[in-house]
């Protein structure tokens, strides 16, 4: 029979053991938190820059895309202080919007406009502010709230741009375009100044592959995905008279195929379990890159980043933890639902004519705008042919309208020549990114032939004064 003293000694021992275990567990928890903190420190901060580069109601889809992206980032855990939004902000409360204060990105979709910060709006949405924001140059921005990317060598940056594009450039609603060479030089400056750890760029625009092809270096820790290659259009979706259509009262396209593919994928998936490469293939299949009539999603830059999880850039939504992926999600969008972005302004005006009472002032104004737009396009088509003939001193110049360089080469070697001709074409011929600037590839061909720049500028002035 054991003594009371023996029982007491056992109890003391067990008590000491419990205290030791508790302290050990506490120490382990503290160590685990230290490791977690260390990991977070190593990962740094996630920054995002979102740019809708257009204005006017018929371009509804670009601001819808950007607003949708913002909602994904916020649900993913990014803070407003680390998200910078560029958008003209003329859609939500446009007199043409039948749902004031609301923007949707898909039929029967929820409002994506609510809560979106207005960092840079109206004339502040321009290329100079865009570059200065990326470079963290607070003194260089004008208008807006002055927010810039204050990133460092441990931070990851996500850039998403949605708008019109053309060979060698993407648009802004005011001022100059974002030229491919200039943009890549900004990225190289950011790398040299150690402004980031890794960067992901998504670009929704026609001929968007030309922004990086043969230009973006592979050693910058930058991974870029474009809606189209350097030679083709991207596509609008959820458009009137297509399937599935938008609510009839909205009257224009709600989204773009590339954009809604990555956005809707991100809405559903657990981003901590999906890699950049996996999303690339999901988006590529949904856009229908295997079908000749659609655009071909392209990727450029640092290939070793393909295994990175999307959560490192756009965060993760805890609500998606139990999502089960199904291949049906990545099925191609029906061709019947696609519209060439350069035709969307025409479609928009046609819809206005159909909806307006016959003979009304609204109907007559829309008919006049439609006729003017069609005539302007015919004039641009003729002007570019005349420019080519006058520049290269040849009569058969049709091949210069469509010929492109070998895959992997940049659009042009002499970017100063290219920018000069593009600006001249805009100023003298009224070419805009909505239509006329689709011919910038032909201007690049002139530069690549070594034709004198002054001679071509003179040809542009002459052709557009006929």
Swiss-Prot record:
This is Vacuolar-processing enzyme delta-isozyme. Glycans are attached at residues 137, 322. The gene is dVPE. It catalyses: Hydrolysis of proteins and small molecule substrates at -Asn-|-Xaa- bonds. The record marks 253 as: Required for post-translational maturation and enzyme activity. It comes from Arabidopsis thaliana (Mouse-ear cress). Seed specific. Restricted to developing seeds at 7 days after anthesis, and, at lower levels, detected in flowers. Detected in siliques, specifically in seed coats (at protein level). Asparagine-specific endopeptidase that may be involved in processing of proteins targeted to vacuoles. Probably involved in post-translational proteolysis of seed storage proteins in the protein storage vacuole of developing seeds. Exhibits a caspase-1-like activity in extracellular granules. At the early stage of seed development, required for the formation of the seed coat, by regulating cell death of specific cell layers in inner integument. Belongs to the peptidase C13 family. Its EC number is 3.4.22.34. It is found in: Secreted, Extracellular space; Secreted, Cell wall; Vacuole. Keywords: Cell wall, Disulfide bond, Glycoprotein, Hydrolase, Protease, Secreted, Signal, Thiol protease, Vacuole.
